[in-house]
């Protein structure tokens, strides 16, 4: 009849079944990649990577590739100079799990530990590391250029003479310690020289090493020593793209094996299982996940209590810091 109320619309049975299957699949996908199933274990705390040991910090605002960061440091709170043995020892004494050092070849083929492309910013020398012999570099003051007041005073001047070490000296001085070696020049020869030294280490020592840097330099190390943990732009890109395609299944691709992945927290949310399930999955293939602050530019680390407060809840991976002495007491129980 024309006056009968409209009948309620019923979904076709096939549509209802399809929607139910989709809902179950989505729920399963969520649960399979939910970080809540891989929370922080009892007694576990973040892995602390001490960037260049304990280093002087500086304001990152306005920093570019050409900025002499030694000229813009904060008033020194510690007496240490980056990439020196006193700085590295202090970082480990404070609770660091790994220290990063910068590596360059000297004119006489030695593996020197120094960051900058030129000597002019931090030292009383000029030119590049590669233009000098190790003996010449030893005579420099690696604390010469540091100032917190625009050049009115230089509080670390005279305190860095003879402190520039070599890679073999760092290994000898820090037995058993985990080290990340960052090749500053993206040259195959630099990678081959570092690989030649690393090949002399026993397997248990080699297992504590990570090598990072440009694609060509790191690839040279990986060709000779594929068991060494590596990190470069190409390495990180290949791993994350492959994981984005396959990680929803729980599978970790081979491109993510034996890696160290420095990641800004803001990008982590796009990764299956972020944060702690992703970290746990990477750990199964001998890969470390290291959280860096901001965009990851200019060595931005978690250096203050306020920085530490930004960490994801229950973070079980690594963190990048220039001030292990400040952050370790906040993260290490007792």
Residue positions per predicted region:
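Phosphate-group recognition and catalysis centered on beta-loop-alpha active-site segments
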Residues: 2-334
């Amino acid at each position: 009849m024309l006056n009968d109320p409209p009948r309620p619309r019923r979904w076709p049975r096939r549509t209802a079944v399809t929607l139910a299957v989709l809902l179950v699949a989505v729920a399963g996908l969520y649960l399979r990649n939910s970080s809540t199933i891989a929370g922080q274990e009892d007694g576990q705390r973040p892995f602390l990577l001490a960037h260049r040991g304990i280093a002087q910090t500086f304001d990152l605002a306005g920093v570019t590739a050409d900025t002499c960061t030694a000229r813009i440091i904060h008033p020194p709170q510690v007496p240490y100079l980056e990439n020196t043995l006193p700085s590295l020892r202090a970082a480990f004494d404070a609770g660091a799990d790994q220290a990063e050092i910068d590596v360059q070849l000297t004119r006489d083929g030695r593996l020197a530990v120094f960051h900058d492309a030129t000597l002019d910013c931090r030292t009383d020398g000029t030119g590049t590391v590669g233009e000098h012999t190790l003996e010449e570099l030893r005579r420099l003051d690696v604390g010469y250029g540091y100032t917190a007041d625009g050049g009115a005073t230089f509080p670390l001047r005279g305190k860095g003479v003879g402190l520039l070490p070599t890679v073999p000296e760092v290994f000898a001085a820090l037995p058993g310690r985990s080290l990340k070696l960052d090749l500053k020049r993206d040259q195959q020869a630099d990678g081959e020289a570092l690989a030649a030294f690393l090949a002399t280490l026993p397997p248990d020592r080699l297992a504590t090493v990570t090598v990072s840097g440009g694609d060509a330099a790191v690839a040279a190390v990986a060709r000779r020593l594929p068991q060494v943990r590596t990190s470069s732009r190409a390495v990180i890109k290949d791993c994350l793209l492959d994981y984005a395609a396959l990680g929803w299944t729980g599978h970790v691709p081979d491109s993510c094996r034996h890696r160290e992945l420095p990641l800004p927290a803001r990008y982590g949310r796009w990764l299956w299982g972020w944060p702690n399930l992703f970290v746990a999955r990477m750990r199964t293939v001998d890969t470390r996940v290291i959280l860096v602050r901001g965009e990851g530019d200019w060595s931005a680390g978690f250096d203050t209590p306020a920085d530490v407060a930004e960490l994801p809840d229950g973070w079980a991976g690594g963190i990048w810091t220039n001030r292990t002495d400040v952050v370790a007491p906040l993260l290490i129980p007792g």
